[in-house]
Amino acid sequence: VPPGVRIAEPIHCLAAIDDGGVDTSHVLVVLGEDAEATVLTETATCGTTGSGTGFHCGGTEIVVGKNALLRMVNVQNWDRGVWHVARQKAVIHENAKLQWTLAALGSRLSQVAQDVALVGKNAEAQVNGVMFTEGKQQLVYNTLQHHEAPSCRSDLLYKGALQDRSRLVW
């Protein structure tokens, strides 16, 4: 998003696979100085009834420029047989704000590494997530918030509801 531009409508990105498919999508979101946007990324398995298989190895990179605001929403809704590996990184500059919300609903196994680097003075990050699992699903999350500049603020809140023999590893 160019400097000074405010996008009123959300930008929607969908990564979908058929049964047995592979996805290696890479999402790059860059907001220039004083820009504002909302981005929704979604993953899904198509043409199945919840038991499709596949493999996803994807990345998300976010750069929030000086005085910019990004509202980022990730919805992971793979079928129960998909293996999901993701690397997510955000860099937040001076007086910029990131509101990042994640929902983990599907997959057989999810391995997610999420880093937020607050590199500018007064940079701010609010990271929220929710997980709902069942059966033998296993979700593994590793989150880091790096306060690299003075007067930065980050807030991290994840909640999970697990059923059956599913597991969540932090």
What annotation goes with each model-predicted range?
Residues 1-170:
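Conserved beta-strand/loop scaffold segments within soluble protein domains that form the structured core
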